[in-house]
Each structure stands twice: as C-alpha cells, then as structure tokens.
C-alpha cells in the first residue's frame, strides 16, 4: 500500500497496560487492515527486586518489566511512537521480531534522551514475537535490565483449533520467564550502583 492508501485506513489508538495484563482488543476483525497506534515511554530508574531490599537500575518500556504486550491482527500496520525522556541518560531503540528489515526497526528508532521516533510496519505473519532494545554493542545489557516485551499477531478471522473450529478466550495474560542479573561483591552481597550507566 502507498502512504496515501495507508492514510485512509481506520486508526485505532491503544492504551497499553502492564503485564501480566494485556490491553483490550478484538479477537476477530474484518478484512480491511487498520493502523494500530501505540505509544511507549522508556524509563530508567532504580527498582526493588526482592523482599530483602535488593535493587537494580532498570531500563524499561512503559515502566514495566517485561514491557507491555501489543496485540494486532495479520495485515494491520503496527505504529509505535517510542519516547526517550530528557531525564534519561542513555540512547535506546526497539527491535520488533514481528518485523523485517532495519533490524526489526532498531536502526530506525534510535532515540537519545529528549527524543522520540515513530515506526510503522505491516504485521504480515501471525504468532507471538519478542521485542527488545537493541543498541549497537549493548543489546544483552539492555535486555537483562528489563527492555523486552511481546507482540501478538492474531489471524484476522480469529484463532482456530487444528480442525479449523473457532477458538475464543475469556482472558489473556502475558506469561514468560526471565532472570535478573545483579552481581555480588567480594562479601557476597548484591552490588548497588548509582545509575544504569554504572551497572
């Protein structure tokens, strides 16, 4: 589709919610694609990770770890505005495994503190995909500090069982497994850092 054709499509603004919850969405949609708009703000802040008061400097999408789950339908255009507030100290971006080219958008969404970027791509295959921050040279660090989440691309006519019968879910949650990496000092205590950059 051309930019003019995309501009005429229905636009749907989505308010993201923190996992394990997932934003409201339709399970089936009509044949005409839509532009589904999301906005995420990057946060860098200290968080407490256990009952003993252990902390880490997290980097997060929309202040949650993992980041919010985004739901679109096959053929829709996912449009994300990624905001890196001026109060942050590091550059960030987003790599969508549901997208192809330009490192899943990472090369097109590099944002320094005080900047924002908007990326739009066509969700052309169904499934559940990861997204994460992918700055050159420090992908793993940003991911283990919390910058990852999920995109779910549903079939336009909804989910079906192997026999082709329609499936409907009453609730949907984000479930995943990830570890936090917090080094220990020579006495065995978890280290504490003054900033994300120091960690």
What function would you assign to each model-found segment?
Residues 1-92, 96-103, 108, 113-116, ...:
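N-terminal, post-signal-peptide metal-ligating segments of extracellular/periplasmic oxidoreductases
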Residues 28-29, 41, 164, 175, ...:
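Non-catalytic, glycine-rich low-complexity segments
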Residues 35, 142-148, 170-172:
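Short edge beta-strand segments in beta-sheet-rich domains
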Residues 42, 151-155, 177:
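Interdomain boundary/hinge segments at the C-termini of tandem beta-sandwich modules
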Residues 43, 83, 134, 177-180:
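Active-site-proximal beta-strand/loop segments in catalytic clefts of secreted hydrolases
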Residues 79-92, 98-161:
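Extracellular/periplasmic metallocenter environments
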Residues 169-199:
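Acidic-aromatic/histidine active-site loop/patch
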């Amino acid at each position: 589709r051309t930019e003019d054709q995309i501009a005429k499509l229905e636009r749907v603004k989505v308010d993201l919610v923190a996992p394990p919850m997932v934003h409201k969405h339709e399970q089936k949609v009509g044949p005409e694609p839509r532009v589904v708009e999301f906005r995420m703000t990057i946060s860098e802040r200290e968080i407490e990770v256990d009952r003993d008061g252990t902390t880490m400097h997290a980097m997060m999408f929309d202040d949650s770890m993992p980041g919010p789950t985004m739901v679109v339908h096959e053929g829709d255009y996912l449009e994300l505005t990624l905001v890196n507030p001026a109060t942050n100290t590091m550059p960030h971006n987003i790599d969508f495994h549901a997208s192809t080219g330009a490192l899943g958008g990472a090369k097109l969404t590099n944002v320094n503190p005080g900047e924002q970027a908007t990326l739009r791509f066509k969700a052309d295959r169904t499934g559940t995909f990861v997204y994460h921050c992918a700055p050159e040279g420090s992908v793993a660090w940003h991911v283990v500090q919390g910058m990852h989440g999920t995109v779910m691309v549903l079939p336009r006519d909804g989910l079906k069982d192997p026999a082709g019968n329609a499936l409907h879910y009453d609730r949907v949650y984000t479930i995943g497994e990830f570890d936090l990496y917090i080094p220990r000092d020579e006495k065995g205590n978890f280290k504490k850092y003054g900033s994300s950059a120091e960690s």
